[in-house]
């Protein structure tokens, strides 16, 4: 049955995030819905911010975090796989200062006036290079986990300084325009990058703990994961919300963070025809034509596991369609709903309620 954890403890312990679609706020409800299920090993197939994986880790489960994005994979290493490595004061000091290296100026040149101020772009080029150059101080697993903590902290700082916490358009003017604002956190936008980074380095290190299990972080396409056995599969996949034609493309929304993860080859992978300089698009694995077949493929591959799906209603495919797909492999399918409004989702104004849904199939 696992450990009993209070709602207050869950809310206070889970790492903060500025990632769109994070289940952090829903975690107490997810915990209450799943805590009586009989499982020990769990795969979080679309790990994202790591909130639900971290919850499972708190519950004492053996957790495998998986996400296809390299930036999210770093969070999985830092907070799920990592049981003891932290960033110490001398590490952070090394990361935020120039250390005599021949620093690149890639972000300063390519992303001028797009996402950050000039001095912030200089800072980013220095800190990113320093994170990679932690290899001068560490090696092996210690290096891997210290770099992951640093990248995780950097990504949180980067998101904090972005309007909507995204990289979907060239909108630096929203920070710099001298206008009355009804939204946005101007105080955070005006906070120096290094202050935000130091704060998130400390927070990330404070969140490192051991649940005495060998937890793992992967960076795989879940559609290709076959033959792996877990007691429970948790899915928070891309899906099509009401009135949308396509599921959210997280690689496009967070392309800047993905670019950082391939910093020294980033220049070769940019679509220079677009004003906001995103990465050249990959073939989409999740679209309106493939989404139903993708669900069926995953349910088939993991039919021996308890399958738990975080979903939205209204959405496409519908909850009823998902339920019918699951009945091809499972005898019992339970639906739980909770009314919820996302910050950037205003559909409730026209009388249409949105629900967070948990589909539990055994």
What kind of feature is each model-predicted range?
Residues 1-43, 51-58, 82:
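S-adenosyl-L-methionine
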Residues 7, 115-249, 264-277:
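SAM-dependent nucleic-acid methyltransferase catalytic core
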Residues 30, 42-56, 65-72, 227-247, ...:
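Conserved proline-anchored active-site loop of SAM-dependent methyltransferases
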Residues 41-112, 125-132, 148-151, 155, ...:
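SAM cofactor-binding core of SAM-dependent methyltransferases
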Residues 240-304:
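SAM-dependent methyltransferase catalytic-core segment centered on the flexible catalytic loop
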Residues 278-330, 337-338:
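Conserved Class I SAM-dependent methyltransferase catalytic core
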